[in-house]
Amino acid sequence: MIGQVRKETRRPAFSKTFLLLLVQLLTFQFNMAASTLANLRPITKVVQGQKMKEGAGVTICRTVGTSTLRNLDPYLMLDELKLPAKAAFAGFPDHPHRGFETCSIMLEGQIEHRDSQGNQGVIGPGGVQWMTAGRGIIHSEMPKGTDGMLWGFQLWINLPKKDKMCKPRYQDYQRGDIPVVESSPGASVRVMAGSHGGVIGPIKMRNPGLLMDVRLAPGANVTQEVPLGWNGFAYVYDGEGKICGSVAQPEHALILGPGDHVTATGGSGTNGLKFLLIAGKPIGEPIVQHGPFVMTTQEEIYQAFRDYQSGRLQDPADNPWKGDDGEL
């Protein structure tokens, strides 16, 4: 009898303690989630893409890098290329770069990349190339083949002054190298850089940032953290829907205001909503840009032109395919 009494008196005490701990744990998790994603970023500006010619007369659609939005630190430019391969065949012949990085993303078709050091490679559908121009690269980007569509993007990212004369470097990734997170029914996120759902993208960045290709079926939703203090935007390339409560449509960049996360919902159309989500920590330094050179002073721009004209822009000892990871 004594043993039975002891069991009966312990059981309620244990149950109350367990329930109290469970409630405290759930409350803590809820508060943590709420505090982590407390401020939805508003859309402060919508930039419509402008059609213009680049390279050997190839038509592109530009949002960042126009008179409407000169730059969004650390981002200098975003172009979308969407043409029949035949119409873009003239491509982008040899041209120089210094002082920044580029990211080329292909959805359809192939671009062949060559530089003055004899390096070459092909970026195919789903592929990504992150190129650190650093102290100097001279290269070409040409369509490979004339069949089908050529559809992709090129993003220019500034480098801080301390890294502008770093050694050039390439990071090439094929479709299978980029993780895809099915974050909710009908929502997929290709994580090129940054983190989504605990999955980290492969691109190594000198300046903290994120780069994602988000695809939402009609009615599907996604939420992505974007750290406080970062600048960012979403570029819609297909379909329609809403991003942070604002209407999203193709060839438009939606500029993110202050906050710590973004949300998006696919529209009712058959294509849902597809967009690039791009955000990064601002560098906060002067941006002096002249064509393919981006430095912090006018004198550095003059020096870049002198180096290019004298054949000293790219150091013969540099091999971007063997970049020094220790510099990252």
Q: Can you name each region flagged by the protein language model?
A:
Residues I2-V5, R11-L328:
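Jelly-roll (double-stranded beta-helix
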